[in-house]
Protein backbone atom coordinates (compact mmCIF):
# COMPACT_ATOMS: atom_id res chain seq x y z
CA UNK A 1 0.00 0.00 0.00
CA UNK A 2 1.26 3.46 -0.88
CA UNK A 3 0.17 6.58 1.00
CA UNK A 4 -0.16 9.81 -0.98
CA UNK A 5 -1.12 13.34 0.06
CA UNK A 6 -2.83 15.74 -2.34
CA UNK A 7 -2.85 19.43 -1.34
CA UNK A 8 -6.17 21.24 -1.71
CA UNK A 9 -7.42 24.76 -0.95
CA UNK A 10 -5.12 26.70 1.39
CA UNK A 11 -4.12 23.99 3.84
CA UNK A 12 -6.17 20.80 3.26
CA UNK A 13 -4.73 17.40 2.48
CA UNK A 14 -6.70 14.76 0.62
CA UNK A 15 -5.19 11.36 1.40
CA UNK A 16 -5.04 8.54 -1.14
CA UNK A 17 -4.04 4.93 -0.51
CA UNK A 18 -3.24 2.83 -3.54
CA UNK A 19 -2.23 -0.80 -3.96
CA UNK A 20 0.17 -2.35 -6.47
CA UNK A 21 -2.67 -2.95 -8.91
CA UNK A 22 -3.44 0.78 -8.95
CA UNK A 23 -6.72 0.54 -7.07
CA UNK A 24 -7.15 3.46 -4.71
CA UNK A 25 -9.03 4.80 -1.71
CA UNK A 26 -9.64 8.56 -1.43
CA UNK A 27 -10.13 10.26 1.94
CA UNK A 28 -12.10 13.50 2.38
CA UNK A 29 -11.99 14.85 -1.18
CA UNK A 30 -13.02 18.45 -0.63
CA UNK A 31 -12.08 19.31 -4.20
CA UNK A 32 -12.31 16.95 -7.17
CA UNK A 33 -9.84 18.64 -9.53
CA UNK A 34 -6.53 17.82 -7.78
CA UNK A 35 -7.76 14.26 -7.17
CA UNK A 36 -8.69 13.77 -10.83
CA UNK A 37 -5.28 15.10 -11.85
CA UNK A 38 -3.54 12.63 -9.52
CA UNK A 39 -5.73 9.75 -10.73
CA UNK A 40 -4.82 10.55 -14.33
CA UNK A 41 -1.11 10.98 -13.62
CA UNK A 42 -0.86 7.70 -11.70
CA UNK A 43 -3.37 5.60 -13.64
CA UNK A 44 -5.29 4.83 -10.46
CA UNK A 45 -8.67 3.11 -10.39
CA UNK A 46 -10.75 4.61 -7.56
CA UNK A 47 -12.67 2.02 -5.53
CA UNK A 48 -13.85 3.93 -2.48
CA UNK A 49 -14.09 7.27 -0.72
CA UNK A 50 -13.94 7.72 3.06
CA UNK A 51 -15.65 10.78 4.55
CA UNK A 52 -14.96 11.78 8.15
CA UNK A 53 -17.55 14.55 8.55
CA UNK A 54 -19.90 16.85 6.67
CA UNK A 55 -17.87 20.06 6.24
CA UNK A 56 -17.63 21.25 2.64
CA UNK A 57 -13.82 21.25 2.47
CA UNK A 58 -13.99 17.48 3.08
CA UNK A 59 -16.94 16.50 0.88
CA UNK A 60 -17.08 19.10 -1.91
CA UNK A 61 -15.49 16.89 -4.56
CA UNK A 62 -17.57 13.76 -3.98
CA UNK A 63 -20.29 14.44 -6.54
CA UNK A 64 -17.88 15.05 -9.42
CA UNK A 65 -15.73 12.03 -8.54
CA UNK A 66 -18.75 9.72 -8.39
CA UNK A 67 -20.03 11.08 -11.72
CA UNK A 68 -16.64 10.28 -13.26
CA UNK A 69 -16.26 6.92 -11.50
CA UNK A 70 -19.76 5.59 -10.72
CA UNK A 71 -18.38 2.35 -9.27
CA UNK A 72 -16.98 4.20 -6.24
CA UNK A 73 -18.47 3.26 -2.86
CA UNK A 74 -18.67 6.32 -0.58
CA UNK A 75 -18.38 5.53 3.14
CA UNK A 76 -19.26 8.12 5.75
CA UNK A 77 -21.12 8.91 8.97
CA UNK A 78 -24.85 9.59 9.05
CA UNK A 79 -24.20 13.35 8.85
CA UNK A 80 -22.74 12.91 5.34
CA UNK A 81 -25.68 11.00 3.88
CA UNK A 82 -26.79 14.07 1.93
CA UNK A 83 -23.20 14.73 0.79
CA UNK A 84 -22.93 11.65 -1.42
CA UNK A 85 -22.39 8.84 1.09
CA UNK A 86 -23.75 5.52 -0.18
CA UNK A 87 -22.62 3.36 2.75
CA UNK A 88 -23.27 4.85 6.20
CA UNK A 89 -20.88 3.49 8.83
CA UNK A 90 -20.77 3.97 12.58
CA UNK A 91 -18.56 3.30 15.58
CA UNK A 92 -17.37 -0.29 15.86
CA UNK A 93 -18.15 -1.22 12.26
CA UNK A 94 -15.58 -2.01 9.59
CA UNK A 95 -15.12 -0.99 5.98
CA UNK A 96 -13.36 -3.57 3.79
CA UNK A 97 -11.43 -1.69 1.11
CA UNK A 98 -8.40 -2.64 -1.01
CA UNK A 99 -8.18 -5.95 0.84
CA UNK A 100 -7.86 -4.24 4.22
CA UNK A 101 -10.27 -3.87 7.12
CA UNK A 102 -10.70 -0.31 8.35
CA UNK A 103 -12.17 0.12 11.82
CA UNK A 104 -14.63 2.98 12.23
CA UNK A 105 -14.08 5.07 15.36
CA UNK A 106 -16.65 7.63 16.50
CA UNK A 107 -14.88 10.88 17.44
CA UNK A 108 -17.50 13.54 18.20
CA UNK A 109 -16.24 17.03 18.98
CA UNK A 110 -15.39 18.92 15.81
CA UNK A 111 -18.80 17.79 14.58
CA UNK A 112 -21.21 15.55 16.44
CA UNK A 113 -21.05 12.76 13.87
CA UNK A 114 -17.32 12.87 13.10
CA UNK A 115 -15.66 9.48 12.56
CA UNK A 116 -12.13 8.26 11.93
CA UNK A 117 -10.86 5.22 10.04
CA UNK A 118 -8.03 2.97 11.21
CA UNK A 119 -6.23 0.09 9.55
CA UNK A 120 -2.78 -0.47 11.00
CA UNK A 121 -0.74 1.64 10.59
CA UNK A 122 -3.00 4.23 8.90
CA UNK A 123 -5.28 6.55 10.88
CA UNK A 124 -7.41 8.93 8.83
CA UNK A 125 -8.57 11.33 11.52
CA UNK A 126 -10.09 14.23 9.57
CA UNK A 127 -10.36 17.26 11.83
CA UNK A 128 -10.22 15.45 15.19
CA UNK A 129 -6.47 15.17 15.75
CA UNK A 130 -3.81 17.40 14.22
CA UNK A 131 -0.07 17.28 14.71
CA UNK A 132 0.44 19.39 17.80
CA UNK A 133 -3.26 20.09 18.21
CA UNK A 134 -6.88 19.06 17.84
CA UNK A 135 -9.93 20.29 15.96
CA UNK A 136 -12.11 23.23 16.92
CA UNK A 137 -15.36 22.41 18.65
CA UNK A 138 -17.99 23.52 16.14
CA UNK A 139 -20.72 21.19 17.39
CA UNK A 140 -19.43 19.05 20.25
CA UNK A 141 -18.28 19.72 23.80
CA UNK A 142 -14.78 19.70 25.30
CA UNK A 143 -15.75 16.51 27.15
CA UNK A 144 -16.68 14.77 23.91
CA UNK A 145 -13.49 15.87 22.17
CA UNK A 146 -11.37 14.80 25.14
CA UNK A 147 -12.85 11.30 25.00
CA UNK A 148 -12.35 11.20 21.22
CA UNK A 149 -8.71 12.25 21.46
CA UNK A 150 -8.18 9.71 24.25
CA UNK A 151 -9.44 6.93 21.97
CA UNK A 152 -7.02 7.89 19.22
CA UNK A 153 -4.10 8.26 21.61
CA UNK A 154 -4.62 4.64 22.70
CA UNK A 155 -3.90 3.29 19.21
CA UNK A 156 -0.54 1.53 18.57
CA UNK A 157 2.69 3.52 18.86
CA UNK A 158 3.53 3.13 15.16
CA UNK A 159 0.19 4.51 13.96
CA UNK A 160 0.59 6.99 11.09
CA UNK A 161 -1.62 9.96 11.90
CA UNK A 162 -3.00 11.33 8.63
CA UNK A 163 -4.54 14.70 9.49
CA UNK A 164 -6.62 16.71 7.05
CA UNK A 165 -4.92 20.11 7.48
CA UNK A 166 -1.43 21.62 7.56
CA UNK A 167 -1.80 23.29 10.95
CA UNK A 168 1.37 21.92 12.52
CA UNK A 169 3.44 25.11 12.68
CA UNK A 170 0.72 27.22 14.30
CA UNK A 171 -0.07 24.36 16.69
CA UNK A 172 3.55 24.15 17.77
CA UNK A 173 3.71 27.90 18.34
CA UNK A 174 0.79 27.44 20.72
CA UNK A 175 2.50 24.48 22.41
CA UNK A 176 5.59 26.64 22.98
CA UNK A 177 3.44 29.34 24.56
CA UNK A 178 2.28 26.76 27.11
CA UNK A 179 5.51 24.79 27.66
CA UNK A 180 8.32 27.06 26.40
CA UNK A 181 11.13 25.01 27.96
CA UNK A 182 10.00 21.55 26.86
CA UNK A 183 12.83 19.94 24.87
CA UNK A 184 10.63 17.71 22.69
CA UNK A 185 8.35 20.58 21.77
CA UNK A 186 11.28 22.88 20.97
CA UNK A 187 13.00 20.24 18.82
CA UNK A 188 9.83 19.47 16.90
CA UNK A 189 9.01 23.15 16.43
CA UNK A 190 12.43 23.72 14.81
CA UNK A 191 11.94 20.73 12.52
CA UNK A 192 8.45 21.85 11.48
CA UNK A 193 9.60 25.42 10.93
CA UNK A 194 12.34 24.20 8.56
CA UNK A 195 9.92 22.00 6.63
CA UNK A 196 7.36 24.76 6.20
CA UNK A 197 10.06 27.25 5.14
CA UNK A 198 10.67 24.85 2.23
CA UNK A 199 6.91 24.48 1.69
CA UNK A 200 7.16 20.80 2.61
CA UNK A 201 4.44 18.73 4.26
CA UNK A 202 4.78 17.90 7.97
CA UNK A 203 2.48 14.87 7.79
CA UNK A 204 1.84 12.06 8.45
CA UNK A 205 3.20 11.84 11.99
CA UNK A 206 3.91 8.83 14.18
CA UNK A 207 1.56 8.59 17.15
CA UNK A 208 4.35 7.72 19.60
CA UNK A 209 6.09 11.00 18.76
CA UNK A 210 2.81 12.92 18.75
CA UNK A 211 2.15 11.96 22.36
CA UNK A 212 5.36 13.77 23.33
CA UNK A 213 4.74 17.07 21.54
CA UNK A 214 0.95 17.48 21.48
CA UNK A 215 -0.19 19.25 24.64
CA UNK A 216 -3.75 17.98 24.09
CA UNK A 217 -2.40 14.44 24.56
CA UNK A 218 -0.48 15.41 27.71
CA UNK A 219 -3.28 16.40 30.09
CA UNK A 220 -1.88 14.04 32.75
CA UNK A 221 1.69 15.30 32.32
CA UNK A 222 3.09 16.89 35.48
CA UNK A 223 4.80 19.75 33.62
CA UNK A 224 1.54 20.76 31.98
CA UNK A 225 -0.40 20.35 35.23
CA UNK A 226 2.06 22.68 36.99
CA UNK A 227 1.62 25.34 34.29
CA UNK A 228 -2.17 25.16 34.50
CA UNK A 229 -2.07 25.23 38.31
CA UNK A 230 -0.32 28.60 38.17
CA UNK A 231 -3.56 30.00 36.73
CA UNK A 232 -6.28 27.71 38.04
CA UNK A 233 -6.59 24.44 39.95
CA UNK A 234 -8.16 21.78 37.77
CA UNK A 235 -8.37 18.26 39.15
CA UNK A 236 -9.43 16.26 36.09
CA UNK A 237 -7.60 15.71 32.75
CA UNK A 238 -10.87 16.52 30.99
CA UNK A 239 -10.96 19.95 32.66
CA UNK A 240 -7.35 20.60 31.68
CA UNK A 241 -8.18 19.65 28.10
CA UNK A 242 -11.04 22.18 28.08
CA UNK A 243 -8.68 24.83 29.48
CA UNK A 244 -6.18 24.16 26.67
CA UNK A 245 -8.87 24.22 23.97
CA UNK A 246 -10.17 27.55 25.28
CA UNK A 247 -6.62 28.98 25.28
CA UNK A 248 -6.03 27.75 21.73
CA UNK A 249 -9.28 29.32 20.53
CA UNK A 250 -7.98 32.70 21.68
CA UNK A 251 -4.35 32.18 20.61
Swiss-Prot record:
GO BP annotation list: methylglyoxal catabolic process to D-lactate via S-lactoyl-glutathione
Principal EC category: hydrolase
Reactions it catalyzes: an S-(2-hydroxyacyl)glutathione + H2O = a 2-hydroxy carboxylate + glutathione + H(+)
InterPro entries hit by this protein: Clx_II_MBL (IPR035680), Glyoxalase_II_hydrolase (IPR050110), HAGH_C (IPR032282), Hydroxyacylglutathione_Hdrlase (IPR017782), Metallo-B-lactamas (IPR001279), RibonucZ/Hydroxyglut_hydro (IPR036866)
Keywords: Hydrolase, Metal-binding, Zinc
Cofactor: Zn(2+)
Name of the protein in its database record: Hydroxyacylglutathione hydrolase
